[in-house]
């Protein structure tokens, strides 16, 4: 039973919260980290802390995603862990939704995931080694009122992950989708003082991602649900 070894991680849709927790955990484990976001200015402190390299990239643009992987490959090494964290929302009553906003939400949440995963898989398959992780949400499995675009994007991302897992797992690529069913606490989003542990801790989520990465291929998960102990489901 062999535990997988990873060298280079690329986190797309990076920012504070879960992405930062993942970057810190990967760095502690000796993995080189690349962070990608539309705006990299916000990533300066995290890069300094983790020795990560930041890249500006619009994940919905095929040329930019291809260029991103080329730069990461040259400057850090071929990513053998790719995490897709990007998502977008367009809220409002169904009849008031703006088509362009809906299209953008789906593009960021789902189409970007396809573009990033395709570039990652293209590099992993010749090596028969690698992992592609997708961050989902409650909306991956449940549609909520006035949140149709987010559900559309997250449902699509989950379908992408499931299809990829069935196709690529037999070729040595571990594909996993994480349903984050609850709010993630952050510097700007604290949990109620009278309800401890009622929100997801990003460090705890990152540890769950890491545990999935460490699974031997004889017992791979393709999906994991994470929620606080008080969350109803």
Positions of the model-derived regions?
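Active-site loop of short-chain dehydrogenase/reductase
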Residues: 6-7, 78-79, 93, 124-137, ...
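The beta1-alpha1 cofactor-binding region of Rossmann-like NAD(H)/NADP(H)-dependent oxidoreductases
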Residues: 56-67, 99
């Amino acid at each position: 039973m062999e535990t997988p070894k990873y060298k280079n991680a690329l986190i797309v849709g990076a920012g504070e919260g879960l992405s930062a927790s993942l970057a810190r955990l990967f760095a502690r484990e000796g993995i080189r980290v690349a962070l990608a976001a539309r705006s990299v200015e916000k990533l300066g402190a995290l890069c300094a802390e983790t020795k990560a390299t930041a890249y500006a990239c619009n994940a919905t643009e095929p040329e930019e995603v291809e260029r991103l992987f080329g730069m990461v490959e040259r400057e850090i090494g071929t990513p053998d862990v790719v995490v897709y964290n990007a998502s977008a929302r367009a809220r409002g009553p169904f009849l008031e939704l703006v088509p362009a906003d809906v299209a953008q939400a789906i593009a960021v949440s789902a189409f970007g995931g396809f573009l990033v995963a395709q570039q990652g898989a293209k590099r992993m398959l010749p090596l028969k080694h690698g992992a592609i992780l997708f961050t989902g949400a409650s909306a991956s499995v449940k549609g909520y009122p006035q949140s149709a675009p987010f559900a559309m994007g997250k449902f699509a991302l989950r379908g992408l992950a499931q299809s990829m897992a069935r196709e690529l797992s037999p070729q040595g690529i571990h594909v996993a989708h994480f349903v984050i069913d609850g709010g993630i606490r952050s510097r700007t989003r604290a949990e109620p003082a009278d309800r401890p542990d009622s929100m997801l801790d990003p460090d705890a989520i990152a540890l769950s991602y890491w545990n999935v990465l460490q699974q031997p291929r004889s017992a791979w998960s393709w999906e994991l649900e994470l929620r606080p102990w008080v969350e109803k489901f």
